[in-house]
From Swiss-Prot:
This is Small ribosomal subunit protein uS2. One of its GO terms (cellular component) is small ribosomal subunit. InterPro entries: Ribosomal_uS2, Ribosomal_uS2_arc, Ribosomal_uS2_CS, Ribosomal_uS2_euk/arc, Ribosomal_uS2_flav_dom_sf. One of its GO terms (molecular function) is structural constituent of ribosome. It comes from Metallosphaera sedula (strain ATCC 51363 / DSM 5348 / JCM 9185 / NBRC 15509 / TH2). Keywords: Ribonucleoprotein, Ribosomal protein. Gene3D superfamilies: Glucose-6-phosphate isomerase like protein, domain 1. Belongs to the universal ribosomal protein uS2 family. The keyword Transmembrane helix does not apply. One of its GO terms (biological process) is translation. Pfam families: Ribosomal_S2 (PF00318).
């Protein structure tokens, strides 16, 4: 077990707490708590911006910020409801961080959205004379710290932005934050999988308790052998 993993281990009491709402009642998460934890969606960084403080569950003795899984789950639901209101092809999902490439591409495939991974061509959202010009109605980004070009252009065009945001995120021009570990391979896979499934549920394309035929593992970037 790495030092980072030891720093994010939760006690049984903490796990019990994370399965209860503000009034102490058991809450139903989109994904079983253990699945969230094993994927590391709650693992933050050693830095926390003022806006992201509201999503923090604990600060470990070594200074590592740990996100509240309940708030991650809640924002996934809110984001899914919001994104489900748009026509699939009007949703643009982008990722400049390599670990997000496969999750974004699979997400787009499942929900019918567009995907742009890697370097985004400047002017893609703002220059109608550009060959790659597109006009999305909403933008989903994997990391506000690395997807800055997309966020800036969306802001210039009045396009709402939904962003997976770690504890160190600067969320200027982001309209809806999904607190999350947006740097981990398994975390990104689970987050995009859960969001895709919930969007289909919100659209009533699948039953409220149904799964999608694509497994979480298929959303995960495969490490080179």
């Amino acid at each position: 077990m790495s030092e980072n993993e030891r720093g994010t281990q939760l006690t049984e009491e903490e796990k019990e707490e994370l399965q209860r709402g503000e009034k102490g009642a058991i809450i139903e998460l989109l994904v079983p708590l253990e699945n969230y934890l094993s994927a590391g969606v709650h693992i933050g960084t050693h830095t926390c911006t003022r806006y992201m403080e509201r999503f923090i569950y604990r600060v470990r003795p070594e200074g590592l910020y740990v996100l509240d899984v309940r708030k991650i789950d809640e924002r996934l639901r809110v984001a899914a409801k919001f994104l489900s209101r748009f026509q699939p092809q009007s949703i643009l999902a982008v990722a400049s961080r390599p670990y997000a490439f496969t999750p974004v591409q699979k997400f787009a495939e499942v929900v019918g959205a567009r995907a742009v991974v890697g370097r985004m061509v400047p002017g893609m959202l703002t220059n109608p004379y550009l060959e790659d010009f597109i006009e999305p109605e909403v933008l989903l980004v994997s990391d506000p710290r690395t997807d800055t070009q997309a966020i800036k252009e969306a802001a210039d065009m009045g396009i709402p932005v939904v962003a997976f945001s770690d504890t160190d995120a600067k969320v200027d021009y982001v309209d809806l934050v999904i607190p999350s570990n947006n740097k981990g391979r398994k975390s990104l896979a689970l987050l995009y999988w859960a969001l895709a499934r919930q969007i289909l549920r919100e659209r009533k394309e699948i039953a409220p308790d149904a799964d999608i035929p694509v497994k979480v593992e298929e959303f995960e970037v495969k490490l080179s052998q």
